[in-house]
Amino acid sequence: MASRRLLAATITYMLARDALAPWRTALGNAELGTEVRGVAAEKRRARALDLLEKVGLKGFEDAYPKALSHGMRQRVALARTFSLGSPILLMDEPFGALDAQTKLQLEDVLLSLWQRERRTVLFITHDLSEAVSMSDRVIVMSSRPGRIIADVPITFGRPRSVRALQKEAHYHELYSQVWSCLEEGLSQ
């Protein structure tokens, strides 16, 4: 049982869907995980307010999920994910259902939060552009049975901006390299 608690304190998981509690405000949702863990009210509120501001939701703290766009709800979920302070974040296609513009914005928000807090992030995505832009390495998996077929180092420095990277020739070279690995894996 103790090992489960240790694991729960070490890893935070962010879903593709926001999974917000509809009866809680943006602030209430952002501090939910820390509340469950027993963090003092003042401390969890301050942390949640700081993160809501960082994800661009200052002024929406008292809004309920039904009043927020899908992108705003994902921002709340991102704030909730970081609020726990876990050293490892598992993110399963967190921006997959967003429109292209909102997705780019949230990718930059995530990079900014990472730059500030330096967490280990395992980011699952089917979007090669997202993988190349945000990662330090891209692990390419084969189709069934899933196995690692390539480990591609991404050599961009930090801090970085997704939109700025996508204009660089090296970005396109890495994208092509990852795409070639993926094609090879699909043909096996």
Short names for language-model regions:
Residues 89-92:
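Catalytic Walker B motif of ABC-type/P-loop ATPase nucleotide-binding domains
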Residues 24-31:
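Short coil-to-helix segment of the ABC ATPase nucleotide-binding domain corresponding to the Q-loop/switch region
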